[in-house]
């Protein structure tokens, strides 16, 4: 039986990180204390695709500035633009081409800012369809 050699473009290193929204009243767990360790970890992992949760726009943009090999998609849950927490997806721009992306609200009205069912706040889901530049394979 022949074994197929796995090529590097067949492997997708995917990570997720709940970065916790910036709450300055959180003392030793505040964003300013956590952010450098997070960047160090992400640089050591070097994920091809990274999903984050709870990122406020300044956190999303900070991460974007520190991960220059990546591009991100995602919007804030409070206005569908920049306000509120983001569930952003970062992907390596030299490995993937973005084909499609969107964010929807987990509610009876998924296409607009809304609170669903028994939730206290808006909840969102961001998705992206990426194409591997080397082989044309697609990944959601």
Give the location of each predicted region.
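Structured beta-strand-rich core segments of catalytic domains in phosphoester-bond hydrolases
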Residues: 49-140
């Amino acid at each position: 039986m022949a074994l197929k050699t796995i090529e590097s473009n067949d492997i997708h290193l995917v990570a997720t990180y709940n970065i916790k929204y910036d709450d300055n009243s959180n003392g030793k767990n505040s964003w300013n204390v956590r952010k450098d360790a997070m960047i160090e970890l992400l640089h050591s992992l070097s994920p091809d695709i990274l999903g984050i949760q709870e990122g406020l726009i300044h956190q999303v943009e900070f991460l974007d500035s520190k991960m220059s090999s990546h591009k991100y998609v995602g919007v804030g849950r409070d206005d569908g633009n920049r306000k509120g927490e983001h569930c952003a997806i970062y992907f390596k721009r030299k490995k993937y081409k973005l084909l499609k992306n969107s964010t929807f609200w987990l509610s009876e009205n998924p296409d607009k800012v809304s609170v669903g069912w028994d939730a206290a706040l808006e909840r969102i889901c961001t998705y992206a369809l990426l194409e591997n530049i080397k082989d044309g394979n697609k990944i959601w």
